[in-house]
From Swiss-Prot:
Residue numbers binding substrate: 72-79, 139-141, 152-154
Species, as recorded: Gloeobacter violaceus (strain ATCC 29082 / PCC 7421)
Identification of the protein by name: Octanoyltransferase
Gene name of the encoded protein: lipB
UniProt enzyme class: transferase
Record flagged with keyword Ribonucleoprotein: no
HAMAP family, per database record: LipB (MF_00013)
Catalytic activity annotation: octanoyl-[ACP] + L-lysyl-[protein] = N(6)-octanoyl-L-lysyl-[protein] + holo-[ACP] + H(+)
Keywords of this entry: Acyltransferase, Cytoplasm, Transferase
NCBIfam families for this protein: lipB, PRK14345.1
Task performed by this protein: Catalyzes the transfer of endogenously produced octanoic acid from octanoyl-acyl-carrier-protein onto the lipoyl domains of lipoate-dependent enzymes. Lipoyl-ACP can also act as a substrate although octanoyl-ACP is likely to be the physiological substrate.
Length: 222
């Protein structure tokens, strides 16, 4: 069973976490013997566009919001407090070199998390993400270089859903939902360890606490 270091830094500005991912990806590509990493965190309010996303899906003046175009796949989405974001930095050569498999496996992690809270999560044919109660509850968008991953998934636990009204989320005009609508009182703090456990189970790895600084070091410290 492989190791996966779990980094849980709390509330992190988007640009900071983006740079961490880039550094972790570069380190993982250069040092294939390093363990995989899973970052679980929240962001202050921010909007991001995928590499080929249509800017018309931003329904307000871009100057009025914090907005970044990233190298991930997918359309525009919102991140903010109450949404649990996962950034796996995985070397897929140790799993399967198949991006379709990777996306479906991330979805399976989230479906199993929802099941732990008594909520039935579902896939929808032709789309990426997870739905529950007829609403999209989790979005995915990834970047892969030399079979090492970055970006990942966002699970709406109890975010400000009004923030999604400023965009066409993931290019879909259908409603966005949250776990708290289906499981009242649930919090990110409750969901986060469940996500870590489901990730370990589905990917067949052992998650253990890690230190970001050690994982970025030139000399292996993690």
């Amino acid at each position: 069973m492989g190791r996966c270091l779990l980094i849980e830094p709390g509330l992190v500005p988007y640009l900071t976490a983006w740079e961490w991912q880039r550094q972790l990806m570069a380190t993982r590509i250069a040092h294939r013997d390093r363990p995989d990493v899973l970052m679980l965190l929240e962001h202050p309010p921010v909007y991001t566009l995928g590499q080929g996303a249509d800017a018309k899906h931003v329904l307000v003046d871009p100057a009025s919001i914090e907005l970044y175009r990233t190298e991930r796949g997918g359309e525009v989405t919102y991140h903010g407090p109450g949404q649990l974001v996962g950034y796996p930095i995985l070397d897929l050569t140790g799993y399967r070199q198949d991006l379709h498999w990777y996306l479906r496996t991330l979805e399976q992690v989230l479906i199993e998390v929802l099941a732990d809270f008594g909520v039935q999560g579902e896939r929808e044919a032709g789309f990426t993400g997870v739905w529950a109660g007829g609403r999209k509850i989790a979005a995915l968008g990834i970047k892969v270089s030399r079979w090492v991953t970055m970006h990942g998934f966002a699970l709406n636990v109890d975010p400000d859903l009004d923030a999604f009204a400023r965009i066409v989320p993931c290019g879909l005009t259908r409603p966005v939902g949250s776990l708290v609508q289906l499981c009242p009182g649930v919090s990110v703090e409750q969901v986060q360890p469940v996500v870590a456990c489901a990730f370990a189970r589905v990917f067949g790895v052992q998650c253990e606490p890690g230190a970001l600084e050690a994982c970025l070091a030139v000399k292996p410290g993690c």
